[in-house]
Amino acid sequence: GQQVIIPAPYWVSYPDMVSLADGEPVIVPCDEQHGWKLTPEQLAAALTPSTRWLILNSPGNPTGAIYSERELRALADVLADYPQVLVMADDIYEPLRYDNTPFTTFAQAAPQLVSRTLTVNGVSKSHAMTGWRLGYAGGPQWLIAAMQILQSQSTSNPSAISQAAAVAALNHSADFLDGWLHTLDKRRQQVLGMIAATEGLSAGIPQGAFSVFANCQRLIGRVTPTGETLRDDSGLANWLLEHTQVAVLHGSAFGMPGYLRIAYAVEDGLLTQACQRIAEACAQLR
């Protein structure tokens, strides 16, 4: 079948979306050493005559990694030899960036590949409007036309109320985003502080989005106070939920075992409680 390259860690839905479209997901594991980002060498090794798409998510979920313009250009150079391959740039977290980290979308970095690029975005993450279910895309005319046909026979169109709300949000973004990003940054620092102070956990600093991808490999194999051995990241996440009532997602769901995704887009008081409970629970493991 036709192949779609998906760098891991990835958003959990990507592989299943490809499978539902009768495609073959090709997972390429990235690593912390390279900032959780796909390298040109990895891309070149994964490409085949059957490759049809590359999915890039920047800022990324679950890691918060952001591709630089130079990194995107390097990937585009590899794709130059594969004219059948299109790129989906998932920019849904675009405005949520910390420390003045610049953002470049793939089509900007590689204008020579604009005719092969689909850029998708929305207001769900940037404007805290997940329930409004509204996104948008830009790409070559033939592809957008095909997407319109598919949507017209499935969801028909976005709610008119959602469209009006999104227009208002986008037209008044600056004031909201400044405050929202400041709040998220404080919460990011709080979670990173908890991780740094908790033996058995470690994490890089996310450049964007609103989750930390924490390494929990040193906790795997440890024993809980009730004598249960935590055999993998899923077991650890389940134990934290049952023992502390704190929900985190195991890295295996994102194609990267041995990690936990800790989201911090929650109310400050709840986040403080969650951090305390995670730290106290991890300290009980032997």
Where are these regions (language model features)?
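PLP-dependent class I/II
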Residues: G1-R286
